[in-house]
């Protein structure tokens, strides 16, 4: 009498299961997002949660910090988004939308997880006040240059007037 153990099909199934076991970890590794892909997914989430009328698109991504290799560990991110011309209700990808002229710019910081299966992020965005700070720096420099120039002009006038000697009639 023949048993199932002696059957050649059992050996084939064992081989198939072994191969599947070897291939599955490779499939899991393939589900790791790149740093930029994780940020773009986070922006999609920001757009879904936003109450603003238009979509936001990545304007500037800060350099990737050094990271460990674990895709399940939250990775720090910081980037800037800008308002686009596309309404939030559109089916377009934000990457296909033009930036809105004088659109709102937001600075975003937080963490993302690169494991695509977990698809997790914790990001907060605020109005980008850096351009106003730069504008303030510009006016301060202008004031310093004008103030310094006025001091020089004032000193030259004072020197000129000091060099004028009253003429005496002889």
Curated annotation (Swiss-Prot):
Where does this polypeptide localize?
A: Secreted; Vesicle
- The domain of life is Eukaryota
Q: GO terms for biological process?
A: antimicrobial humoral immune response mediated by antimicrobial peptide; defense response to Gram-negative bacterium; defense response to Gram-positive bacterium; innate immune response; neutrophil activation
A Gene Ontology term for the protein's cellular component = extracellular space
Query: Does the record bear Disulfide bond in its keywords?
Result: yes
**Similarity comment: family membership:** Belongs to the cathelicidin family.
Asked if the record carries the keyword Zinc-finger, the reply is no
Q: Name the propeptide positions.
A: 31-131
**Per the annotation, which location comes first and is thus the protein's main one?**
secreted
Q: Which SUPFAM superfamilies match?
A: Cystatin/monellin
UniProt keywords (A-Z) are: Antibiotic, Antimicrobial, Cleavage on pair of basic residues, Disulfide bond, Immunity, Innate immunity, Secreted, Signal
Q: Where is the signal peptide?
A: 1-30
Show the segment(s) annotated as Active core: 150-162
Query: What protein name does the entry list?
Result: Cathelicidin antimicrobial peptide
Q: Which GO terms describe its molecular function?
A: lipopolysaccharide binding
Question: Describe its PTM?
Answer: Proteolytically cleaved by proteinase PRTN3 into antibacterial peptide LL-37. Proteolytically cleaved by cathepsin CTSG and neutrophil elastase ELANE. After secretion onto the skin surface, the CAMP gene product is processed by a serine protease-dependent mechanism into multiple novel antimicrobial peptides distinct from and shorter than cathelicidin LL-37. These peptides show enhanced antimicrobial action, acquiring the ability to kill skin pathogens such as S.aureus, E.coli and C.albicans. These peptides have lost the ability to stimulate CXCL8/IL8 release from keratinocytes. The peptides act synergistically, killing bacteria at lower concentrations when present together, and maintain activity at increased salt condition.
What does the function comment of this entry state? Antimicrobial protein that is an integral component of the innate immune system. Binds to bacterial lipopolysaccharides (LPS). Acts via neutrophil N-formyl peptide receptors to enhance the release of CXCL2. Postsecretory processing generates multiple cathelicidin antimicrobial peptides with various lengths which act as a topical antimicrobial defense in sweat on skin. The unprocessed precursor form, cathelicidin antimicrobial peptide, inhibits the growth of Gram-negative E.coli and E.aerogenes with efficiencies comparable to that of the mature peptide LL-37 (in vitro).
Domain text: The cathelin-like domain (CLD), which is the propeptide part, does not seem to exhibit auto-inhibitory function, as it does not inhibit the antibacterial activity of antibacterial peptide LL-37.
Q: List the disulfide bonds.
A: 86-97, 108-125
